[in-house]
Curated annotation (Swiss-Prot):
Subcellular location field: Cytoplasm
Protein name: Methenyltetrahydromethanopterin cyclohydrolase
Gene: mch
GO cellular component: cytoplasm
Keywords of the record: Cytoplasm, Hydrolase, Methanogenesis, One-carbon metabolism
Lineage: Archaea, Methanobacteriati, Methanobacteriota, Methanomada group, Methanobacteria
Organism name: Methanothermobacter thermautotrophicus (strain ATCC 29096 / DSM 1053 / JCM 10044 / NBRC 100330 / Delta H) (Methanobacterium thermoautotrophicum)
E.C. numbers: 3.5.4.27
Length: 320
């Protein structure tokens, strides 16, 4: 079976080789692990964001950036485009922010292929029937500071690899790379909701594609989190090709999949988060979804479309 860590390593090698051009910094720690700063103490770049997103997806997706993105005739922004022939593995088996990395006073949400070695969370890998067996572990962290050896040692132990084979990429939410990689979760937001909220077998999703605008960079981490989530919730468009079975209600799946189907829909995410006392667990899971969904049922040939791009809320969120 394909290895998300080995595929992602090909991208990481390119990033290390072109670090100066990408405006990123590569540090080798004393335990041999490698930390790649993509926005903490460096500027990062558009290309670095594109490659970082590819790493998050385990190297199993094509990532591109349109400038300007064709969000609508009257409102255009640079946008991230995702295409994958391995939707379940690339989005849920790699990209999903499913590992809460906490060591001492360091905390970050971990995404990327190393999760398929540590099996975090195990339920996700049981659902998609996947586990990696690579001898290299690659993790991306959404954090405002860089991890030390204690963090990479923990990652090595959890993934059962040597510390020298651990590669950690870091980008704050409030950085350009952070903004790009969160918009790059547009397809994953849909597969996540299919599995976690609608309890649909995501292995039936054979191909997927999506596009979402890149949120303006905001130095305030909380406001940046709001804007980046809104880029997908109000501006993300996705396409899923599903091999259904008799009894699957794909029309209902499509109708319930967009963010607008959520009870909490209607406000910028920052406002929703603030009203929830900054507690993610108080927010309806169904809100984390793309704005618009198109599903092609490969068994029947039917096509279903639901949701819409909400330009008004997007512009309100972005301050336009």
């Amino acid at each position: 079976m394909v290895s998300v860590n080995l595929e992602a390593k090909k991208i990481v090698d390119r990033m290390i080789e072109k670090a100066d051009d990408l405006k990123i910094k590569v540090d080798k720690l004393e335990n041999g692990s490698t930390v790649i700063d993509c926005g903490v103490n460096v500027d990062g770049s558009i290309k670095a964001g594109e490659l970082y997103t590819g790493v998050c997806l385990g190297g199993l997706a094509d990532v591109g950036i349109s400038i300007p993105g064709d969000l609508s005739e009257r409102f255009a922004l640079p946008s991230v485009k995702i295409k994958t022939d391995f939707p379940a593995i690339s989005t849920l088996g790699a990209q999903k922010a499913g590992w809460s990395v906490s060591v001492g006073d360091f905390f970050a949400l971990g995404s990327g292929p190393a999760r398929a070695l540590s099996l975090k969370p195990a339920e996700t890998y049981e659902e998609i029937g996947y586990q990696d067996e690579a001898d290299v572990a690659i993790l991306t962290l959404e954090a405002d500071k860089l991890p030390g050896e204690d963090v990479t040692d923990m990652i090595a132990e959890e993934c059962d690899v040597a510390a020298e084979n651990v590669y950690v990429l870091v980008a704050p939410t409030s950085s350009l790379v952070g903004s790009i990689q969160i918009s790059g979760r547009v397809v994953e937001n849909g597969t996540y909701k299919m599995l976690e909220a609608l309890h649909f077998d995501v292995n039936k999703v054979k191909y997927a594609a999506g596009i979402a605008p890149i949120a303006p960079v905001d130095p305030d981490s909380l406001k940046a989190m709001g804007k980046t989530n809104d880029a997908v919730l109000f501006g993300g468009r996705t396409y899923y090709y599903i091999e259904s079975e008799e009894g699957d209600d794909i029309k209902s799946l499509a109708e319930n999949l967009p963010s607008s189907a959520s009870e909490g829909y209607g406000k910028p995410f920052y406002d929703v988060f603030r009203e929830a006392d900054y507690d993610f667990y108080k927010i309806d899971k169904g809100m984390f979804a793309p704005a618009e969904v198109v599903i092609n049922d490969l068994r029947t040939g039917d096509v279903f479309r639901a949701g819409f791009v909400n330009e008004e809320l997007l512009m309100k969120s972005f301050g336009l």
